Design a protein with these regions (language model features):
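FMN-binding flavodoxin-like domain, especially the glycine-rich phosphate-binding loop
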Residues: 1-8, 12-20, 25-39, 43-167
């Protein structure tokens, strides 16, 4: 399957989830990309079976950000392959990737890949930096390479749900 259209859906108050989601989306190399920024308002998506989607949200306290899930509640897929990405502040992402995968699966998407990337912690300061400057250029290059791996998986017919607990 070669998706013609990708949906890049993210909640990104500090911009870290957006940067990684866009990099993964570039790696998918779809002819058309639709960006759905749920940072300030709820979004509605009606993805089709032949599309692909990237969902990226920050981790708060080991969980997918609750406000992100509320803002993404109206997304719908039709067996649409999805990449789930969580951004964590260099502490732990715990159950966030599983929660996001379950969330999108309940809305008609098939989680075919998952990743956790480090993003600058929201508590980071000049005096007490926590993952300062992340994701950086290397992180975004890795995210784009990850998107290319997913593109190859989809081209080979890989639209089976993965077990995100193994991440």
């Amino acid at each position: 399957m070669k998706p013609a259209k990708s949906w890049i859906c993210y909640f990104s108050p500090t911009g870290t989830s957006r940067r990684v989601a866009e990099a993964v989306g570039r790696g998918l190399n779809c002819a058309q990309t639709i960006v759905c920024d749920a940072t300030h308002d709820a979004v509605s998506v009606a993805a089709e079976r032949g599309d692909a989607a990237v969902f990226a949200v920050p981790v708060y306290g080991g969980h997918a950000a609750p406000l992100a899930l509320r803002r993404l509640d109206a997304v719908r897929g039709d067996g649409t392959p999805a990449v789930v990405v969580v951004l964590y502040g260099n502490r732990a992402y715990e159950h966030a990737a599983c929660e996001l995968a379950d969330f999108v699966a309940a809305r008609g998407f098939v989680p075919v890949a998952a990743a956790a990337f480090v993003g600058e912690h929201s508590y980071s300061t000049a005096r007490w930096p926590i993952a300062a400057g992340r994701p950086d250029g290397d992180d975004c290059a890795e995210a784009e390479a990850f998107g290319r791996v997913v593109e190859a998986k989809l081209a080979a017919g890989g639209v089976r749900a993965i077990d995100v607990k193994r991440l």
